[in-house]
């Protein structure tokens, strides 16, 4: 059909490729040197978890800014973003796109919180790929406070809105252990939820969100 899609790759100039030879023993705390060198680094300790959060935020923030830049170039109405774009959240790794996009719309684009949440919720969709724990991420709130403190108030607001609407602890974004359930955020603040295959959709129906009776999954 003569259509061409662009593949955008994000990187930072400070990355030190010489540390690749160190393999999995590299210094995970040297974020400016290793941020984009190793995908899914060892997360068996706190430093590895924080690096993953840094990586995820780096990618989603760049993507959010790119989407808004391209919409401005095309003179699209940001308040109808969902008419021009769909942001597909595959697994929970890009889940921070939701609070990040809300943050930018509120801080830089003169949206109210309600307006930003509505637009983002109509633009983002979530696809479950697995039921493995590493895919359905649950980040300690304290980790997010270290890496992305600017997103924490937004995540708390999103969680509070869910808590005001649903009392079931199984569907909360921030649980009683102060862990942020990224999949729950995607489910509550996306317009579509499905599995990458039929079995993954059934997993969503039968296991993880057994209390999401307010949702209709395909």
Where are the regions that the model predicts?
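Polar, glycine-rich mid-to-C-terminal structural blocks
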Residues: 153-179
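Conserved small/polar residues in nucleotide/adenosyl-binding loops
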Residues: 213-218
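Core structural elements
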Residues: 88-100, 123-127
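Secondary-structure transition/capping motifs at alpha-helix termini
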Residues: 70-82, 105-118, 130, 134, ...
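Extended catalytic-interface subdomain
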Residues: 187, 194-196, 203
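Extended, well-ordered alpha-helical scaffold/bundle regions in very large, multi-domain proteins
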Residues: 106-156
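Alpha-helical support elements that line or immediately flank enzyme active sites
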Residues: 61-65, 100-107
């Amino acid at each position: 059909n003569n259509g061409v899609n662009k593949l955008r790759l994000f990187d930072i100039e400070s990355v030190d490729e010489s540390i690749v030879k160190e393999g999995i023993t590299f210094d995970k705390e040297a974020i400016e040197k290793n941020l984009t060198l190793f995908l899914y680094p060892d997360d068996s300790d706190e430093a590895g978890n924080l690096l993953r959060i840094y990586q995820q935020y780096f990618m989603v923030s760049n993507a959010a800014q790119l989407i808004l830049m391209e919409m401005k170039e095309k003179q699209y109405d940001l308040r109808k973003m969902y008419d021009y774009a769909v942001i597909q959240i595959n697994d929970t790794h890009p889940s921070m796109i939701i609070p990040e996009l809300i943050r930018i719309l509120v801080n830089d684009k003169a949206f109210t919180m309600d307006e930003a949440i509505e637009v983002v919720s109509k633009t983002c969709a979530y696809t479950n790929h697995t039921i493995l724990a590493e895919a359905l991420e649950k980040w300690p709130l304290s980790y997010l406070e270290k890496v992305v403190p600017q997103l924490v108030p937004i995540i708390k607001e999103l969680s509070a809105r869910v808590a005001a609407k649903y009392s079931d602890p199984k569907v909360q974004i921030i649980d009683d252990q102060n862990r942020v359930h990224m999949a729950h955020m995607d489910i509550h603040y996306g317009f579509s939820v499905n599995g990458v295959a039929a079995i993954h959709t059934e997993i969503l129906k039968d296991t993880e969100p057994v209390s999401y009776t307010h949702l209709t999954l395909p």
